[in-house]
């Protein structure tokens, strides 16, 4: 141990002489150091200048494992060593010797390591050290001595290359890192520039690990003045490679950079986001988010959204699914490791985002805004959905905003369900943390009135159940049960649908929570028949899929069903039948699957069969006395056979089938005879016989006698008799449906046994009712109506039954039956018009009875929007503009309450029976989807028959226009009901929801995809019919939009026009289906597009990419524009093209859409009678079409200016009932529509002009000023139109959108004017002067509204005046900012009316108040009071 005694001056001199002697013999010293090793106690035996000076200064060098020791304070050591060196006789040469000694000493790696590691305080026995517990390393201490620093720095940098090729850890130490660490936090660095320069040079040649160490140490080495320069170099390095991303960003985040450089570096980081390694991605994102400023947060987040693609993170996750296929267990283990790593990286990524969102308010709001600003459907990603969920769960303040944005995106189709499925399936580890938010949002979405939002909420439930743990699954089930028990129709239906999907996809999982589902049985009174069917399907599937576990559910179901069947309440009996038949379906399924009944014990199957037989007997006994209940039983059994086609036990079929085969002929069929015995209200006549050549064994449907027997008095007589079963015509169609499905099931689809029923006649009466109805009594008219309803429903079921038969003769008979239906509908329409208050017999029995008495109105719609009646046009005498505007104040917006079909039905011509019978749809039997296979038949119009008289039409029966219109109308109703559009209308009010499934019972048992597949198969015949329509209208409309009425058959024209309308609507309903956005339906979409594209390129479309198929389909449909017969057809064609072009919308399609919409707007739409098309629905379509034109045109401001500067003046100069010659759709009646759209689109377009920035170049400023100049000019033109068109709706539009425009100007234009005023003073002054004129007119409107005390208008006034006042002060602030207050002057702004006349009551009071109160000011804007009450000069113009 070396003694710690202090050296005297003599000792110091002796040491110096020794040092001097040693310095003269360097060779000897080096050989000693290199050859001689330390003794066992760890000291050095032979000392040189280096060792001696260190020892005398207080450092004891150690070799081996021991660290160097320091006996004095660090600063004392440095001072002693510096003094010793400076006073050494050979100074400054001694410095070189000292460095040489250091160099020799650190050749040994263990000694070098000791010099790089912190020294330890030297301790002596029995004494306490005064040295601090932590001491720097020897090298660090030497670097703190200025005379040694340059040489030590050079020595250390030269040592680094020695370790280039060392594997870290070879010697147990990372030497490069230790070396670089010595340069950190040096207080007295002599040449910082040189050190950093050498380090950067070293960086360029070093291996990656050493580069990593150097970069991460730079922030602690650099001086403040060097940070920006080095940051630029690091930014360049960041762009060159991806291996140093993490250390570079780590270093940059610790540097104090100026704003410009920070933006540049952040942009560099942004560019590498798409290609950076997954494990480095969290670091990159953290750097970007933590260095974002409030001013550019939205821009940065928007760029980040575009760059960050989670699909690259999914690729490793896909290995999880394929790992089972790997033969090697080692490979499988490796795959699992990769998947885990990938999931952890994604988790870290969202943890980074979560931290930024939680602690940086700007980031949270900017992310929401960035998602909100994204408009294209293709721009939205899984990332957006996850971030919205993250913000919703993290920031309580942003929850409402987040929910609003998510709702909006779902409604617009930007957040398809496929996107959500990807999020749940690929990132479940991340999303599980947001489960409370997911549950909350799903519950909220189910309350929505928008089908797309409701569907999204239900999908959230399904995905959460599928991918989360048991706790989450239980919460999902409890939430769904709560929805069902809430009594809300929408929630109830959707929740049951979700549970149905879950029981199909995850029966074993749902069975765990069957106890919760079973509690719904306690709330059965709230369920309608369709909902009961769904519930019992769910419970039956759970009860019978695994017999032992589900036995307790079976007992409860039996108990409830028996209770209902025994009830005397018809509604309860109805519920019991539906429950019983649904349960039968689950019991009677063939057990041939691996988990089916073949593996079960025989006695269990016998027990179930016994239960089933007992249940069947009970149901049959309870039904036989009530026709409606018996008809329901027949329908439910028929639905069961159809749904489980081929899977039902044959014994069950035989049990009720044999009696059915016997009962139907006995009850409803009689032998055909010339006369019928009995007394009836009308003489019996056999009609519609298609088998007149078959006289022997002919049969007929005994309809009229049965209808006579079913009258109330006769039914009572029958009930008093001892008959067990009542025969009613109500049961005719349901019983036949069950018979034909039973027969088809037993005979592999063949209906040969009952084909006589297709052509057999009906016992009706003479149906030539023209002119006879007025002479009939009410009872006779109602009897006749009932007879026609029964006949129509019989024919509809016959068509359902035989439409798929391949025999040519039977096909012909089916087409004839369709003709019979259209003929009977004409007769029925006339009868119903003469029989007000008549309620038809029921035709559907599994839905609640429609409320109220249906009515028929051949001249117009049954109901108006919001259920309100239209006021009489003659109520007041006022201007044409005011009258029409008041009528259409609500009609100029797209109608959200009526469906497309309801809207079209209200405007159809009086001659179309379909328009008359719309309100009676619930009283007709439902057509099956298979009926539409008849559309494959060709179209034969009367005009073709007239020109080909030699052709006998009886030889080939083809589909006529009336039959085509009938089929298309029904198909469109079905499609609209089941295919939810991506951007959808609102659901009708909840009070109407109870009847929404009436007439769609069979359809609702099919999934939307099944319906879509069916329609895609029909696209070829639909295209054929469309082309026939196109050819027809090209001949009758030789000039664009002008009907050639010479020799025109008006009725045929109307029918063909209706067919065209329905065809286009069918295309729109199909291609707007939201399901096409889901990945699993992509092949179906391709098949649909391929059919359309094949019409232009036959045989060339099979291998075309999707984008080309879309383009060809778009072009095919675009070709129909020349033959469009009505504005409604034009509107729907535009919607079809929109639906197709959005997948995706490209530049040339936008141009075509704008051109097409403008063409329709510039076309004169006339009816065949010569009247101009008009009405609220015309206005609604016009609103949408005008929006399409302005949204897709290249220059929206120019388009608005053209309409307002060309079209409107033409209208003003035209006659009272005239229109614009350039835009014939612009008339005094439609002006409010044009005005609203132009104002809304103008306000929307200026919001897209970026706000002015100080950094904008002069050219950019000028371009923005030009845009604002045009916008303000358009605004001025539109506002001044109020002087001519002063109706209340126009004023309301002005006040609303005027305020929004001024607010947008304040937010976006004023910053631009601040920075461009000096450079472009004249332009700014001109802009403000023009705007001043507009805002002055707005002020006049405020006065006008107050004078007339119109509450609808005055509600807008306070907010508008506030905006105008803000504008005044904002202009003053701009002038002050530019030191140019004299550029404008202010004056008194007087209150005037719309025509500019001063309001007298205020004019007389003005002189008195002028001196006492503050005056309203008029700068570049309008009305604002000076808060300080100062007077201003009268006037108000800018200089």
Swiss-Prot record:
Monoubiquitinated on Lys-563 during S phase and upon genotoxic stress. Deubiquitinated by USP1 as cells enter G2/M, or once DNA repair is completed. Monoubiquitination prevents DNA release from the FANCI-FANCD2 complex. FANCD2 is only ubiquitinated in the FANCI-FANCD2 complex and the monoubiquitination of FANCD2 is promoted by phosphorylation of FANCI. Phosphorylated in response to various genotoxic stresses by ATM and/or ATR. It is found in: Nucleus. GO terms for cellular component: nucleoplasm. One of its GO terms (biological process) is DNA repair. Its main location: nucleus. There is a cross-link at residue 563 (Glycyl lysine isopeptide (Lys-Gly) (interchain with G-Cter in ubiquitin)). Keywords: Isopeptide bond, Nucleus, Ubl conjugation. InterPro entries: FANCD2 (IPR029448). The keyword Ubl conjugation applies. It comes from the Eukaryota. It holds the Pfam family FancD2. Homodimer; cannot be ubiquitinated and does not bind DNA. Part of a FANCI-FANCD2 heterodimeric complex that binds and scans dsDNA for DNA damage. Interacts directly with FANCE and FANCI. Interacts with USP1 and MEN1. The ubiquitinated form specifically interacts with BRCA1 and BLM. Both the nonubiquitinated and the monoubiquitinated forms interact with BRCA2; this interaction is mediated by phosphorylated FANCG and the complex also includes XCCR3. The ubiquitinated form specifically interacts with MTMR15/FAN1 (via UBZ-type zinc finger), leading to recruit MTMR15/FAN1 to sites of DNA damage. Belongs to the Fanconi anemia protein FANCD2 family. Required for maintenance of chromosomal stability. Promotes accurate and efficient pairing of homologs during meiosis. Involved in the repair of DNA double-strand breaks, both by homologous recombination and single-strand annealing. The FANCI-FANCD2 complex binds and scans double-stranded DNA (dsDNA) for DNA damage; this complex stalls at DNA junctions between double-stranded DNA and single-stranded DNA. May participate in S phase and G2 phase checkpoint activation upon DNA damage. This is Fanconi anemia group D2 protein. The gene is FANCD2.
